[in-house]
Each structure stands twice: as C-alpha cells, then as structure tokens.
C-alpha cells in the first residue's frame, strides 16, 4: 500500500517557534558573505508559497490506484487489454517512463480509441488533443510484480473490489428480473401442459445425446492437474468366463521341479516338431517373414557329409522308404516319408505333404459358371473359340483353360490327380512355403513347385525338368537299364 503523506509544514501555525527557527537557520546558512537578506514576517501569502515549495520538495503528486484504468481495444472479442503510459508513470512515480523501460511494447492511440476512452470517462477533452501512449496490460502487471510489489498489492485490492461490485450488480439485475417474473406469472392452459412436458423431455433427451456424443468425440481424453497425466478411456475387451480364469491350488511353480497347473497344450500337428531328437518335421517357417536361403548350408552340408555318411544315409532312407511307400498307397495321412533335411540329395527321402500327393479317387474342384482368368470366357469357348473344360485352383477361386495356360493333355490329366495350385497360391512341395519365388521351379510333368535349395540344386536348370514323384512313374529308363546290364554280362 502506498504510504499516506504526512502533514506539510505549511499547514501548521506560521508563528510556531520551531518553524520560525528553521526559517532563520536556512537564511543564516544561505548567506555567503554578502549582505544577508532582510527578515520578513510570514503572512498569509507567504504561507501558500511555502506550501507549494514543500510539496515539490517532498516528491511527485499522489495518484490513487482507483484512477488507474485498464481497457480493452478493440472492444470486440479480438481485442487486447491496455493501460495508458501517462497513468502508469504517474501511479508508479516514474518521471520518464519511456527512457527507463524502452523494451516494453507501446503504441500511439488512434483517434477512435481516444473517443472511446472519452466516452468511458477515462480521459478528458484536453487529453484527447494530446499524444497518448498505450502499454500492454500484462507487461505492466509483470513490471509492478517485479519492481513495485507495494503498488501491485494496492492495485490488486482495487481489482478485487471492482470484480465484487460487478458480480453484485449482475446478481441484483437477475434477482430483479426473477421478481418481475414472479409478480407477473405466465398463464398456462391446463390442456397444453402434457404437450409442454413432452417438449421438455424431448429437449432434455436431445441435450443429453448431444452432450454424450460431444464428450466421446471431442473430450475423450482429459489432463489430470494433480498427477499431470492425460487420462484416456479404456478400450473395450472381451471377458473370459469365470471357469477359465479360476486359479487352482498350484497356479505357478515357486521352486524348480514343482508341479504347476499352468502349461501349454500342444496339438497333434505341433507335436510333430517336438521333441528335437525325434522330430518328424523340420521347424516351420513363419509365413509373415521371408525364409532364409539355405543354398550355402545345403551345398556345404552335402559336400562335407555326403562321403562320411553315405552308407548310413542310404540304409536309413531305404528302410524308411519301404515302410513309407506302403503307407502312401493306403492313404494314411499321419505318416511322413523321411526326416532328411530339405537340402539333402535323396530322391526317396524328401518329405512331402498330402496336398501334393496323388491320392487315388481324388476329384478336382468343380466351380459352376467359372471364367478363365486369361481370356475371360467360360467353358463354352476358349481363346480359339472352341469349347474346353476349365481347371480350378484348389486354394482359391482362380480358373483357366488348359490351352490358355499352355498345358498339354498329359499335364492336365496329371493335374486332376492331386490338389493343383495356381501361380498365386503355388507352394514348395518340400517345405510347404510360398517364399523365394525367384528360386521356385516347376515340374514339366505334374506342374508341382519346388525350391532349388529344397531339392539340392544351385540354380534353376535349363530345359525340361522332372521331379522325383514323376520320375518314379516313368518306367522306360529303368527297363533300358535292366536290358543293358544283361547284355554287358554276356
């Protein structure tokens, strides 16, 4: 709070001895050897002049905080709050405010702004003709907080009082309007009361629905001021039945070897890959990830271990093939031909899935009203205009004419003996994986797909290539070999 000025010496009796002695001492000390001024008795006129002199000696005139005005310009929603530099400098007691605080943002008042302040009784008509300067209100408040805390405290009290008066005025106006309504109540017809109730309920329902929709769409997350955490609604999730989440007496093992009820249940298909020492299948590849090339592994493993384990491998494969050959003919799907690696060179020891085997009595898929994917025609006519039956993929809905796919009659007959796959669905017969399409080659007799590294080849061979399954069915080379050996023996 600003200090209240003490009574000036001129307000006391001029004839007071203390005052007169001070006057005499000043006159005696001011003499510098010249003729001393004559003493005069202080009259009424002298007291007024002495009062003005003492006022200037004590300091600048007091500017009350009530006169410090903060206004908004422009008055609309886009306006900002300002203060007049002349009022601020007079309130803070700063003579040259601009030179002392040159870094503050300031601007000159426009003519419209001066007229607005004149209407608000902030400035006088004389001040309208002068050049006035506006300062940003927030910068002035920050300056008072840092360098003039007493002035800021005094101004804060005034602001609180103004806010209290504004709230009281608004409350009085609202109370007066309510009283007027109570004195003059509206007359409602009794027959229209149910209609008004329905309208009110409808309006309330619309408000609640709009409020909930706005809260879910625009205010789903909120900032917690106490924990400084952004709270987000929890997502919906499915709840398991109680019997699935009920814990037993041994939920988890606390020491090694202790029994626990939580363990993984493997399906029969998964057990074929476990345990490692008696696994029937190789570890499967993840369809979502690219398979690793096994060219180098197959080449190095075949070259280094072929000589050392040739006899043992041949005996194992021969014994396994004799038993597995019978199981293939009988149609038992749970048996697998061999445990050899995909890169091992053994025609009889390559594991193959049942979908690539020629199953006796297999019937190909029948799709009515199928259309060829190449010529976009049905079985009534192919690209040459002749009727031709279509072949269908066993995995998808693709179909095609054999002539459009450049397939021979023998190849079509072979395809109808097993679940044939189109180019988009083609998988390797050995590893059952669709990866490494650049290393995939196809048999010219049955159109089955094989990876080069799965059959022990470095690259795709040139010319015609026949897979192991089709080479078993070809009996001509075997007869020639049998006829040659007796001739040599003779």
Swiss-Prot record:
Gene name, Swiss-Prot/TrEMBL: phf10
Compositionally biased intervals (Low complexity): 284-293, 314-331
GO molecular function list: zinc ion binding
Assembly and oligomerization: Component of neural progenitors-specific chromatin remodeling complex (npBAF complex), a subfamily of ATP-dependent SWI/SNF chromatin remodeling complexes.
Keywords: Metal-binding, Neurogenesis, Nucleus, Repeat, Transcription, Transcription regulation, Zinc, Zinc-finger
Record flagged with keyword Coiled coil: no
Gene Ontology biological process: nervous system development
The protein's name in its UniProt record: PHD finger protein 10
Region (Disordered): 1-61, 284-362
Residues in coiled coil: none
Biased composition (Acidic residues): 294-305
SMART domains per record: PHD (SM00249)
Role description: Involved in transcription activity regulation by chromatin remodeling in the context of the neural progenitors-specific chromatin remodeling complex (npBAF complex). May play a role in the proliferation of neural progenitors.
PANTHER family found in the cross-reference section: HL01030P-RELATED, PHD FINGER PROTEIN 10
Zinc finger (PHD-type) boundaries: 371-428, 430-473
Organism whose genome encodes this protein: Danio rerio
InterPro entries referenced in this protein's UniProt entry, alphabetically: PHF10_PHD_finger_1, Znf_FYVE_PHD, Znf_PHD, Znf_PHD-finger, Znf_RING/FYVE/PHD
Region feature (SAY): 83-292
Family note: Belongs to the SAYP family.
Keyword Aminoacyl-tRNA synthetase: no
GO cellular component: npBAF complex
Subcellular location: Nucleus
